[in-house]
Amino acid sequence: MTIFAAVTGGFKGAFAVHSWIVLKDRDGKAYDRYDVVGWGAPIRRNAYVPDGYWYSNPPQPVWETTGAEAERLIPKIEAAIAAYPHGKRGAYRLWPGPNSNSFVAYILRKVPEIDAVLPPNAIGRDYIADGAFYHFDPAGDVNLTLYGLLGVSAGLKSGFELHLLGLVAGVDFRRPAVKVPAFGQFGS
């Protein structure tokens, strides 16, 4: 299983990525790609090639795992996808969310065993899809947000981040890097 992100199209591509998740169970014959888009039914399953380009931009893996760990996580991920509260027509909002990045971030919050954080330029990742203003990760991360517009995150997964209008600035201490608004992460 892999979480991908790719630079999005048009003006948005100047400062944002689109993220999605790809699953394949042990006995699966093909990969299943799940992402959210702003037209039609928001949650799409296999509408696009699993590792395909997005608006002519190559995807980058954000996190991946295989084997027993993937087998253990896939049912939890599928349950989180089914429970996503913004999966109905008309629920998508480009900014500040809920959008494609809010969807993948929701899965990461519901399945905290996935040791990943979406890139800083995944606009919408800080919109907490449950409507909450905070989230405490079992690993110790704390996320505080006002609908993804203003917030702060701190912890081992996130490092330290400030969020303003969907943009993120901060530092990652575990994988030494600087998070720069609209550009992403520089470092490891």
Language model: regions and residue ranges:
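C-terminal charged interaction modules
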Residues: 121-123, 128, 132-140
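Active-site nucleophilic cysteine motif
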Residues: 92-111, 115-118, 122-127
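Non-catalytic ligand/cofactor/substrate-binding and regulatory segments of enzyme domains
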Residues: 1-96, 109-110, 135-188
